[in-house]
Amino acid sequence: MSEMTVDGKNVKTEYETDANYNGSVTGTEANPMGYLIDKVFKTGGNATVENTETLWKNSSTALREFATKLSAKTLTSSVADNHKTDFKSGNATTGANECKQGFWFLMDTTADPKGTVNANAIESQSIPMLLATKLVNPTDQDAPDYAGATANLGTVTLKANEPSINKEITKVNKADADSKTKMNARIGDTITYTLTTTIPDYTGYVDGSRVLQLIDTAAHGLKDVTVTKVKVGDTELNEDADADNNGYVLKRDKNQIDPLDNCNKADATVTTVDLAHYVNTNDNIASGATVTVTLTAVVDSDAVIAGVGNPNTVELAYSRTPSGEKHQVPGPTVRVYTYDFSIYKTNMAGDTALSGAQFAIARVDSNAETFMTQDAATKAWKNLTTAKPAADADEGVFTTSADGKIAMSGLPAGEYHVYEIKAPDGYTSIGLPDFKFTITPTFDTAGTTVTSVAYEKTTNTDGNRVSFGTGETASMAQIKNAKNLTELPMTGDLGIKVFVTVGVLLMAAGAAFALSARMRA
């Protein structure tokens, strides 16, 4: 009471001078609680104290302030056994608790009740409150309430919040995601994630101790994690918490041990959006409003290929008790997957690796082809155009090295078209192979870990000069080159291509010979 003021007046001082309630003034029995109920807890218009629904939901009312301060006092000092009793919600079948008639202070002391939505969640405790017992009718002990009582005395509904947080993949580059929990991506792609939770009702929670943090952990294959927007409802918050009440603090730690599956490198990125400033200093907290955090990450060359993918998790840290006890609850894990592909160039016998062969690769989407290039240093992919690159072009040309190989790691599942655009030195350029293929993963029963990846040709126009390996070489396409026409198969589509090409060359040669002969004549 001594810590409370109403209308600028100290409540304890006012009580001590009121002869109607302070027994020391008149020598009668002291009634401090009666004074509080009659003089302090009533709202404007002299409303009766039993109309408390709005009073309890408003942290600024005297009734709420008194309960909050009494709760803090109770936590730091002992209460005699003869002045307290244990109440239990839903006791027996009626929910009734036996206690002395009077006015009781009710404080939730439930320890770590587990949530029903998430086994790791812990429901927040109900706020402290003041509650009157039912009034006993002195002439009829079996009557439920004293005759003429208008208030619903002796009953309270305790509402414990079970906090939760959600996370979704919403975009890959500029395209909407086709799944909210797992996505295919290339190295170099930018992934957009959306985190959502709800602002709790902090009525009765001590200012300065309220906790609300959204904690994002990105696996080591996801870099450049950037928070692009934080909103409460439709209001965008500022990163600088000191700017105004609509602020938050952003914390980043890039040297955390990755707790996700088999990703154990010590460079996972932990990003914390701390809303402590908003929930502790804002007088108009939007309780029940949706908190939306948008962030991006880039798939880089450290990305896990297939397997468990590249997970991204989220946790919510919140105040479990009105005194500010903190607890964390996990949200869903979302994953980004990427896959290997490589080329191995050989002679027709398959026993000699060939360097200097040039290729182009296009992503096929509904028969539309978009050619791609890959940065040699970062391994990041980017789109070019629908036009096939020419041999020796600056972008989009992949050349076999001395071992005859080209690594094209970091591709999403889907369909591709590979073109050989330049033969190795000493090999014919007639009928250069091109082929389409698909990358198709198979997941475990949980749908989170890739157990196998199938690489399959979807065209057969190469004269069986292209084949995928098995086991460890399943992602490698062996492509054979012929030195001359006699090594090329002359059946099927390839045979037609060769005959047409040779025919065109012969026609061109014949036309040139005829022109030369005419000029000599």
Which residues make up each language-model segment?
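Solvent-exposed loop/turn and edge beta-strand elements of beta-rich ligand-binding domains
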Residues: 1-521
